[in-house]
Regions:
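Outer-membrane beta-barrel transmembrane strand signature
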Residues: 41-68, 73-83, 152-192
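A beta-strand signature from Gram-negative outer-membrane beta-barrel systems
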Residues: 1-8, 60-62, 81-86
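Transmembrane beta-barrel domains of bacterial outer-membrane proteins
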Residues: 71-75, 79-82, 87, 99-104, ...
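Surface-exposed loop/interface segments of Gram-negative outer-membrane beta-barrel transport/assembly proteins
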Residues: 2-46, 88-92, 98, 102-182, ...
Length: 265
């Protein structure tokens, strides 16, 4: 099917869920044990399982589509991809977009061969800031507390006397995001000057940027905290290669000359 554009697609879909949780006291069991042992507790009258409150069913999907075609002297391929991953914890997810293009063209009866390519991607993550505090708090936080904010103060109820234990639902409102954007291009020109002599010119450019942002409200961090940062990187590469290969009687000559320049910022 030379000369005709063909299309290929593949995709997948999945679900992830928590298999097992730590066995902790429910609100009713907590009250019962406290009553039996004569222990005074702060009872807000609820029966909340905070481990399950911060969990979700994570949906996962992948999609990839490609367009390609060509002939004996020219060919091309363009592809697009998308990946979406939800974690089993609220507000934990990853998205990735990719694109790729390659083209090859031969001209002048094989004297000149041109190859061009470009790749780009965008990766976005929403992360959990502190795994230890999140899961420790979910397992040990007072189960008589509600699973919603105080309607009067519009804030999460906390326990000021508890060390390293914060309302786990407050951790779900923390923002910790990072995004990575990447693009790379290249070009290769091959000149078949003679049967034995070949000249190759190659150039490539890469650009990468990483952005980080974080926001911790006062409900989980004493005075609150906010951060935003950006890191950029550029790379430029170029080289020229001349090769000569020749067989003569019982001998074989293979000569290579190479010049290269690279710059990174």
């Amino acid at each position: 099917m030379q000369g005709r554009t063909q299309v290929a697609y593949n995709g997948s879909f999945g679900i992830s869920t928590v298999y097992k949780n730590l066995k902790m006291l429910s609100g009713d069991e907590f009250r019962s044990v406290a009553s039996e042992r004569g222990i005074s507790i702060l009872d807000k009258g609820n029966n909340t399982n905070f481990q399950k409150e911060i969990q979700q069913t994570g949906l996962q999907q992948n999609h990839h589509v490609a367009f390609y075609g060509g002939s004996s002297t020219s060919s091309y391929r363009v592809s697009l991809g998308f990946m979406d991953r939800q974690g089993v914890i609220l507000n934990e997810d990853m998205k990735n977009f990719t694109s790729n293009m390659n083209m090859n063209q031969k001209m002048f009866d094989g004297f000149f061969d041109c190859e061009l390519g470009m790749f780009g991607s965008i990766l976005k993550n929403h992360n959990l800031v502190d795994y230890q505090k999140t899961f420790y708090s979910a397992a040990t936080f007072n189960p008589t507390y509600p699973n919603h904010k105080d309607p009067v103060t519009n804030s999460w109820d906390g326990i000021t006397t508890a060390s390293q234990i914060t309302n786990p639902l407050a951790w779900m409102q923390v923002d910790d995001d990072d995004a990575t954007s990447h693009i790379s291009t290249h070009a290769r020109f091959t000149f078949n000057l003679m049967k034995e002599l070949k000249l190759v010119l190659f150039g490539a450019y890469t650009y990468n940027i990483v952005e980080n942002s974080q926001y911790l409200p006062t409900s989980v961090w004493a005075n609150g905290q906010a951060y935003k940062g950006t890191k950029k990187m550029e790379s430029l590469l170029g080289n020229m290669m001349l090769t000569y290969k020749k067989g003569w009687k019982k001998h074989f000559f293979d000569v290579l000359a190479l010049a290269e320049l690279q710059k990174e910022t």
